[in-house]
C-alpha cells in the first residue's frame, strides 16, 4: 500500500473478538506525526501568566491575545489605544505591560509589542525558531536606535556650540 497524507501501511494483524472468538484480519495503518502548520499555546506559561495578573489587567492581556498578528506575533498599538479599547486606565495598561515585560511574555518598542512565541504562535518549527530570534532581537534593535539617536544629538550639540 502506498503512503498517503502521512499514513503508512505496516502490514496486517489477526485479532480475536473476545466475545465471539471470531478471528478478524485488519490492516495496520500509522500516521506520521508531522510538525506542520500549527498554533501552539503553552498551557503552563498561560496559567503562570494568569496567576501574575488579575481583574482589569486580565482584560488587557485578553485584548493583546485577541489582537496580536499571528504571522509575526506583533501588535501595533499605543498604550492609550489599548486603554481606550479595553476600558481601563492608562496607568493600568502601563503597569500590566511592565509586568508582562518583566515576565518575558512581551517585548516593546514605541507603539509595537511582540508576544513571546513560546507562549503563542502559528506555524511550523522553522517559523518558531525564526520568531524566537526575532523576539530576542526585538528590544535590542529599539535600544540601539535610541543610543544612536542620543549619540547624534550629542555630536550635533557639540558642533553647534563651536
Curated annotation (Swiss-Prot):
Classification via SUPFAM superfamilies: Winged helix' DNA-binding domain
Entry-linked InterPro entries: HTH_CRP (IPR012318), Plasmid_replication_RepL (IPR008813), WH-like_DNA-bd_sf (IPR036388), WH_DNA-bd_sf (IPR036390)
Alphabetical UniProt keywords: DNA replication, Plasmid
SMART domains named among the record's database cross-references: HTH_CRP (SM00419)
Molecular function, one GO term: DNA binding
Alphabetized Pfam families for the sequence: RepL
GO biological process, one term: regulation of DNA-templated transcription
Name listed for the protein in its UniProt record: Replication and maintenance protein
Origin species: Staphylococcus epidermidis
Gene giving rise to this polypeptide: repL
